Structure formats: C-alpha cells, structure tokens
A protein has these predicted regions:
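Chalcogenol-based redox active-site neighborhoods
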Residues: 1-156
Length: 156
C-alpha cells in the first residue's frame, strides 16, 4: 500500500522496546513523526537516530512525538536504544505488518534478507492525517529532515 498525503494514517498497534503497547490512534491530539529504519546497529540507521536523539529538544518544543520503527525484535531494539542513549521510543514491527501497510518494506534487501523496513518518514498531524510521506529505496540515504522540520514547525 502506498500512503498518500492527506489520507488518514492507517492505524496500528506495536510494542516498544520496553514492552509497552503503542497504538497510533491513541496518539490523536499530537503531531507525530514516524521513522521507519532498516536495521538497528547499522551505520546509516545509527547516524539517523542519533541525530534525532541530539535534536530531541526541537521535537519536544514543537510538541511532536517521534517514533522509530524497524523489523528488529524488542530485545534488539532495547539494546540498540540503550547503547546509543536514544531518548524516544523504538517500536518493533517484527511481523512486518506495519512496514507493509505503510509501503515501507523491502521484499528483498541486501544479502538476500527478506522483509526489512525501508528508510521512511511520515508526519501525522493531530487529527491523524498524513501530512508528509517519504519512502526511500536507497537505504544509505536519509529522509529530508529540513523539509520535515519545516513542516512540523508549521503544524504547531
């Protein structure tokens, strides 16, 4: 499925790395940034998420909640979050349903790995509407954070 700007964000429930259940529709009233990433402990993913960590005060100041999402297990994400001192939730899409729902799943990734999340960014506004959607085919690229921050600032 391809997500289109202006459509309601598909609802989902996933567990975070501390085993809390997170349901998207429960987040209405907050602007959200969903960041799908291929795999924990890889260089580009680490750089991307550490950049968010280092700038989390920006997101907090504009009342935007950030979630990282990958197909890694809860345990892998917990270790990754701890080792990188990440200060926002990481959600496990181990069964790949949400990555698929958001059009963010490689059928075949490098080294013949199947079912890895594509690096993607989605902004969902307070009403649950998709305001930004960027799905990257090249896992070594990062989302356009300049556009993301400008849009989020406008949604305050």
């Amino acid at each position: 499925m391809n997500i289109k700007i202006g459509q309601p964000a598909p609802d989902f429930t996933l567990y975070d790395s501390t085993k809390n259940k997170i349901t998207l529709s429960d987040m209405k009233g907050q602007n959200l940034l969903l960041l799908f990433f291929p795999l924990a402990f890889t260089s580009t993913c680490t750089a991307e998420l550490c950049s968010i960590r280092d700038n989390i005060s920006f997101y907090n100041n504009i009342n935007a909640k950030v979630f990282g999402i990958s197909v890694d297990s809860l345990h892998t994400l917990a270790k990754f979050k701890s080792e990188q001192s990440l200060n926002f939730p990481l959600l496990s899409d181990f069964n790949k349903n949400v990555s698929s729902l958001y059009g963010s799943l490689y059928e075949m990734f490098s080294y013949n790995m199947q079912g890895v999340s594509k690096r993607s960014a989605f902004i969902i506004d307070k009403e649950g509407i998709v305001r930004y959607a960027e799905v990257l085919e090249n896992a070594s690229e990062q989302p356009n954070f300049k556009n993301i921050t400008l849009l989020l600032e406008g949604l305050k």
